[in-house]
Each structure stands twice: as structure tokens, then as C-alpha cells.
Regions:
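Structured C-terminal helix/loop/strand segments within mature extracytoplasmic catalytic/sensor domains
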Residues: 24-61, 167, 172, 232, ...
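Active-site-adjacent loops and short helices of periplasmic peptidoglycan-processing enzymes
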Residues: 26-204
Length: 359
């Protein structure tokens, strides 16, 4: 086997301090230095205090978790916000595909691209991990539309579809510019799945990793000390990090039509409602008539610790009341505890809604 190139990743600044568990918004917290093109947290409008019983439940759920968790829930109707450790930066993983989609729809709104624009994917576009589109690409190339890439990236969390969409609208900088222009706050965006995942592992990306199990073999060939240092550095200061509060507030603005045109807003939320991933997360706790338009994210597993298990989206009650929710976790064990926590938070939000609105 050929030797594997790897590097130690130094100089990324201090870890972001974890926010204190609180049901009240805290508007300032120290953040690590941001990478070029990233955005400093912005001050947002103050919301009302969340219902005390719900805030207490979310705090109790968060404190009982085996790992690190951040939760933010925003009621769009009543303008309250319930937070737990919601200013800490958490790994987004595939949740960052949402911002690629928003940037793409924003480009559509500005007339820069059309969702009907054709694109062709070849072997050089392949990424790693989950990429269902790979079989079509390996069959001699695959021509599709930007709209199809967006749908596949969100609903199936396809890494290759996402990265091709990102490059088609201007690359990582276009996404970062959108985040900054729309004042989304404490949300970072890295350079796509290939760059992100290889850096987390302690590797330098090679396109050969996109085929078969080459990435896994290269990662396994690294000294454990390299993998551990790279993984822990990412957990401390994630290159794609986002604060649950910023994510929930961004989702609330999306739902309210503040980020995109009415047509693009409806289309993106409809696509998010078709998401197939995360069946054991928030969706598993829904009661009849409730809807969940969302994006999931799952990180790499190193010695049983997961670099992010997340579910973010818009929870809608049968009466139309909408809640923006961001639940972001770094579990100490891959034992299903993160998924259970998400279900418990969802049940608490639904129970609070039913108690206050009569079911």
C-alpha cells in the first residue's frame, strides 16, 4: 500500500467556551478566532422568555445528556425562545447543506442561476461517505439540473450533489457571503465535504479517496495520535461550527420569508419536508398532524465518540403554529442517546403547545 500523506493541524485558536445552560437568551459570549470568510456573531432582537415549564424541561434534558448538547427553540407565533447551551459552536456536519441550499435559492432569486440549469458530474466531482449519486456518475457521467442537485443534497444528504451545487453557485465563498449578507450570525461554513472530512480525520484530500473504501483505508493507516489530535481539535473549534441559537433564528427567518422570495421559501421548506434521513430523531417523536421540515447532520466516529449528531428544522403544529428548532450534540457514546434526547425535546415542545392551545 502506498504511504499516506498526513499532517498535524495546528494554530486554530482556543476552544469556544460553552454557554451556560439557560432558558434566557444570553447575547454575548467569547468566541475563538474565526477562519477567513467566516462571520462574527451578530446581536439579534430580544425575544420573550419561554414558558417556564418548557424551559425547565429542556434544561433537565440537556443536563442529563452523556456528552455536549445545545438546544434552541423559537416560537414564531409567540416570539419566545428557549435555549440550552445555545451559544457554543457545534459541528454542523451535513446541516451545513441547508446554507448551500439557501445560497442557491438566493442566487435564483437574484437571477444569477436557474434551478433548470444543466450540470454534468464526472469522477472528479465525487466526494466521500454518503453519495447515492455516485453510481450514476460512475456509469459514464451524469447530467442533471441544479434543482435536482439541491433536492438530492437536502433530502438524501448526498455529499457529491451538495458540493457540485456549491461549486456551481460560486463555491464556499458564495455561501459565506450569503451568511454574512443576511446577518445570520454565529454560523461558519467550510470548504465542502472533501476538505472538511479529510481535515477532521487528519488527512490531506486526494481524489483517489472518493472511490471504494480508499478514504477509510487511508484514515485507518494514520497513527492514532494523529487522528485523536485532529478529531479533538475539530470538536473544540469546529471549522463548520454553528451556535444552535443562530441556527434556530436563521430557520425562523427562513420560515417568515426574510431570507428568500416567497416562492423560493415555499420550495425550500417543501424540499426540507421531504428529507429521508434522521428517522429516529425528531421525526420519530411527532404526533399525528405535526410536520417536520429539516436537515440532519452526522459526524465521524472516533473511538465511540461522534463528531456531531444534529437535527435542525421547522416543527409545525396541526393548527399552523411553527417552531424553529436546532438540536446539536456531541455524544460521548454512539448508543442512541442523541436521538433519544431529540425525541424528548420534541415531545416537550409538543406537550407545551397542546397544554397552551388545547391540543
Amino acid at each position: 500500500m502506498t504511504s499516506v500523506s498526513y499532517r498535524f493541524l495546528f494554530g486554530l485558536g482556543l476552544a469556544t467556551a460553552a454557554g451556560l445552560a439557560s432558558s434566557q437568551p444570553v447575547r454575548t459570549d467569547p468566541l475563538a478566532p474565526l477562519p477567513p470568510g467566516s462571520v462574527r456573531p451578530q446581536v439579534t432582537s430580544t425575544t420573550r422568555a419561554a414558558p417556564a415549564s418548557l424551559a425547565a424541561q429542556i434544561n433537565a434534558i440537556g443536563r442529563g445528556f452523556n456528552g455536549i448538547v445545545g438546544v434552541s427553540v423559537v416560537s414564531l407565533r409567540d416570539n419566545w425562545q428557549a435555549d440550552y447551551n445555545a451559544t457554543r459552536l457545534f459541528p454542523q456536519q451535513s446541516c451545513s447543506k441547508l446554507w448551500v441550499a439557501v445560497a442557491a435559492m438566493d442566487a435564483v432569486d437574484k437571477g444569477r442561476v436557474s434551478l433548470n440549469d444543466k450540470v454534468t458530474l464526472g469522477r472528479s466531482d465525487l466526494t466521500l461517505f454518503h453519495q447515492p449519486i455516485r453510481s450514476k456518475v460512475l456509469g459514464g457521467g451524469h447530467t442533471t439540473t441544479l434543482g435536482s442537485l439541491l433536492f438530492t443534497a437536502i433530502t438524501q444528504s448526498d455529499n457529491t450533489a451538495n458540493d457540485k451545487l456549491m461549486r456551481s453557485i460560486g463555491g464556499p465563498e458564495a455561501v459565506r457571503n450569503m451568511i454574512e449578507a443576511k446577518n445570520l450570525g454565529s454560523i461558519r461554513f467550510y470548504d465542502g465535504e472533501r476538505a472538511l472530512q479529510s481535515r477532521i480525520a487528519g488527512l490531506i484530500w486526494s481524489q483517489s479517496y472518493s472511490i471504494g473504501d480508499a478514504f477509510y483505508k487511508a484514515r485507518s493507516a494514520l497513527p492514532t495520535s494523529v487522528r485523536k489530535a485532529s478529531f479533538e481539535r475539530y470538536i473544540r473549534d469546529p471549522y463548520d461550527g454553528a451556535a444552535p441559537r443562530a441556527v434556530a433564528e436563521g430557520l425562523a427567518r427562513l420560515q417568515k420569508g426574510e431570507l428568500l422570495s416567497p416562492g423560493s421559501t415555499r420550495r425550500l421548506l417543501s424540499i426540507m419536508a421531504s428529507t429521508k434521513t434522521g428517522g429516529l430523531r425528531v421525526r420519530a417523536a411527532l404526533k399525528p398532524g405535526w410536520e417536520w421540515s429539516h436537515k440532519t447532520g452526522t459526524g465521524q466516529n472516533f473511538q465511540g465518540r461522534i463528531g456531531g449528531i444534529n437535527d435542525i428544522g421547522i416543527l409545525t403544529a396541526p393548527d399552523g403554529t411553527a417552531y424553529a428548532m436546532a438540536i446539536m450534540t456531541i455524544p460521548n457514546k454512539s448508543d442512541g442517546g442523541a436521538q433519544e434526547l431529540m425525541r424528548e425535546v420534541t415531545k416537550a415542545v409538543i406537550a407545551n403547545h397542546e397544554a397552551r392551545r388545547g391540543g
